[in-house]
């Protein structure tokens, strides 16, 4: 073999090695981004007898799954490339209707699939409740309520500002018209951001307190029951880029840091002491609601599921601080009705984790929850139809009439039948731009109101004043003049029928049988 050939061979080998190393280096720098897509869930709504649930997902990295309830257990899972199939076994249900979450995780990606199971004795179809029960009488006095949304709860640059979200100033005429329309109560959400001084006094701005008091006066003169609260001071939102937007009522921080929790409780005590003192002489028409939608930004499916109950315990502490602060001011506040809400005001999480505060006043606490199920229909307008007559391709795969009945029946069993009044502090459904979709919207709202009355609860529509159509457009009445927005009168009429009709032939069943076709 010649020296030239040997050298040429060596050069070729070196070049080949360089090429291989180059390719290897290039390939290793291309990393697949994590993703998670749910392909199918079958079935998502279980019969009482139980059975198997199959969930198929596509993901990178390979997904894992875990149930948050003991009655659903993982039986097996198989993976091939990016596809994973999970099989769960659900036990037979011997009690009330129930639901559970199955968390699917792939790297940093996570989703929760809600599985529902019917009651073994159809308790979701309970007859109308005895309206002579004390808790029902209280709820019935609140009746059908209207939220003055995106008003005193609005804020810009972390400062509360009544007109910053598009509504003009609310007037006495507004609430007179609300009463005339058929509502019996008004919930007045209040944000206090930028209106509170530094520690240790946390003095509330006098002008802002006066404006809140002025709107409460409007409600009183209109003959409406009224609820005021601390609203967006606890708002939290996790943005798509991961940015965690939150404010001083930081449930995550408080659960991790005792000093932060102590500081939050001191501010909460000071603020509710001042609010209660300002309204000490107001009569029973006025209710205080301590907090609103406190959560970690994931709406009940975040770190609250993995922190061993710390956030639930912190929220229970905050609610106790609220009750103690109000009661200590005396006067009418010694026995004023107070609204208590659980984690993110979820009915399910409230029932599971809320510990009702100790209260020196007897039977003066109310439970507040919110209901927008399914949010993809009620809030986001991703689906145009709802209920058993909706086209499968145009409605969400869960959250129909049976789900609603189960949720309300569970609240009835947990609270109303035990003497604790319940009000649905927020519910609603956004306006659509066509008659067919509006028919399903009105059916949904009528059904919610009828189900609330049937189960002995009050219910409040969320009106944010937005006169458009689509996502977050839930205006029924102009917030300055009280005039109707779009088909607001028609929508209010079906809700008042749903809540107030005493016709014995008008039931949830008859309403169901007359759903839009």
Give the role of each language-model region.
Residues 434-517:
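Aromatic-rich peripheral "rim/lid" segments of glycoside hydrolase catalytic domains that contact
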Residues 166-186, 200-232, 236-290, 315-330:
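An active-site-proximal structural segment forming one wall of the substrate-binding cleft
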Residues 256, 262-399, 409-430, 454-457:
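Active-site region of glycoside hydrolase catalytic domains
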Residues 37-66:
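Solvent-exposed, low-complexity, repeat-rich "mucin-like" stalks and linkers
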Residues 96-108:
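A short beta-strand micro-motif common to beta-rich folds, especially ectodomain repeats
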Residues 121-185:
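N-terminal carbohydrate-binding accessory modules
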Residues 18-40, 107-128:
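Bacterial Sec-dependent N-terminal signal peptides
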Residues 58-85:
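Surface-exposed binding patches on compact interaction domains or structured appendages
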